[in-house]
């Protein structure tokens, strides 16, 4: 997986899902993230903790900005002191390399 992020390659109908044989490798690169499945669709998610709602909202907006740059958007749930970010590629109904690259970007925003 490259750290270079293309424009939403995962949004193309012919985009390939992550090879199941590579899934563990990609997950190991974002160790705080967990694999989930909803209605047969694989996703990755992580809960980020904050001291208050304002910091959680600031993080949400930063993640939203990077999503807009690429035109690839996560599910964001913002609560007092917590943000859950969930990535998957809607068009292909599963995980693409881009989802893991975007998870890495979220980590960079959180750790900045």
From Swiss-Prot:
GO terms for biological process: tetrahydrobiopterin biosynthetic process. InterPro entries: PCD_sf, Pterin-4-alpha-carb_dehyd, Pterin_deHydtase. GO terms for molecular function: 4-alpha-hydroxytetrahydrobiopterin dehydratase activity. Its EC number is 4.2.1.96. It is an enzyme of class 4 (lyase). It catalyses: (4aS,6R)-4a-hydroxy-L-erythro-5,6,7,8-tetrahydrobiopterin = (6R)-L-erythro-6,7-dihydrobiopterin + H2O. It holds the Pfam family Pterin_4a. Keywords: Lyase. The keyword Transport does not apply. Belongs to the pterin-4-alpha-carbinolamine dehydratase family. NCBIfam families: PRK00823.1-1. This is Putative pterin-4-alpha-carbinolamine dehydratase. It comes from Hahella chejuensis (strain KCTC 2396).
